[in-house]
Amino acid sequence: MDQQKVNLLNYNYSQLRELLMAWDEKPFRAQQLFQWIHQVGIRDFAQMTNLGKVLRNKLSQLACIDLPEIVACQKSADGTHKWLLKLECGNCIETVFIPEANRGTLCVSSQVGCALNCSFCSTAKQGFNRNLSTAEIIGQVWLAARELSDNNGAHDKKITNVVMMGMGEPLLNFDNVVSAMSIMMDDLAYGLSKRRVTLSTSGVLPEMERLREVSPVALAVSLHAPTDELRNELVPINKKYPLSQLISLCKRYFKDEPRRKVTFEYVMLKGVNDQPEHASQLIKLLHNVPAKVNLIPFNPFPLTQYQRSSRETIDAFRDKLIKHGINTITRKTRGDDIDAACGQLAGEVKDKTTRSQRWQKLHFMSKTDKSTELTISSEEIA
């Protein structure tokens, strides 16, 4: 990116309006420009024909619309797409699109790597490098929308839902994530409702409180254990924000919207958190919580110590929760043949802690060996 130019993808609508006014332009120009960028998907200011030649020239001199670079794309047998995106700094992140009969869900990353070190998560093994900018977050949506439209026809596959469940802990990149989500929900951009944008967190309580006030999107909590002792091992941030505090906040999170529920994600690990006593503990923990539970079959990755629970064990766990009145489903595993399933996103992170060099090499080789559709550069796609 030209260091003298501002990347307009970093601006939500209100910020873009202020920017144009600072450049002595009429406020209504922000709406036109915003729609060109996000609804039409145009990056070339010369093609924005209703802006006027003087403004187009000014934008060319002062601004740019810079995106991550698509360096690889994989497509699963089930239709799931995974893109490897290279950032300006040289790191890579991953973005996944999951098509279903009546919806298309895009899984978006918020950080390069992750600092929380959850023991069952592939991204955690990469270490942490930095937060993504608003442009790098919303750029994933922009690129996916264009790729799906270009390759499948304008109406074949469409993004109807976004989940902030990719690489990183979204609430540790609060301002940029909230700004990007505001663009996703803006009718002048992608027009998603607040119920169709979901943020997943491991439980960063102060930022959960802030999120509740400023951006009431759907909330998913990475729970994964029914006791502090076990969750301390699986999700180490629990040592700072224990279950009693987390559940207390979840009980009141949607107090003004009693029909909304918090989704609790629970990865099923063989012999670790999947036994009948764990189900009983979870039932007790979620008593009087407006909750629904997603049971997630564990997705293995290189060097992991964990195994996936059997289908029979998962079904028995689910049935016990349902019997006690907890809305529970088992998440269908999608894209695991291309390492796009939950917990498998890894990208390529220049880890400042250098903890992951050996793991990265093994992970890359396993992905290369398994993939039958590891593709091509963005230029070849275009």
Curated annotation (Swiss-Prot):
The active site is at E94 (proton acceptor), C342 (s-methylcysteine intermediate). Its cofactor is [4Fe-4S] cluster. The keyword rRNA processing applies. Residues 100-339 form the Radical SAM core domain. It is found in: Cytoplasm. Signal peptide: none annotated. HAMAP family: RNA_methyltr_RlmN. Reaction proceeds by a ping-pong mechanism involving intermediate methylation of a conserved cysteine residue. Specifically methylates position 2 of adenine 2503 in 23S rRNA and position 2 of adenine 37 in tRNAs. m2A2503 modification seems to play a crucial role in the proofreading step occurring at the peptidyl transferase center and thus would serve to optimize ribosomal fidelity. This is Dual-specificity RNA methyltransferase RlmN.
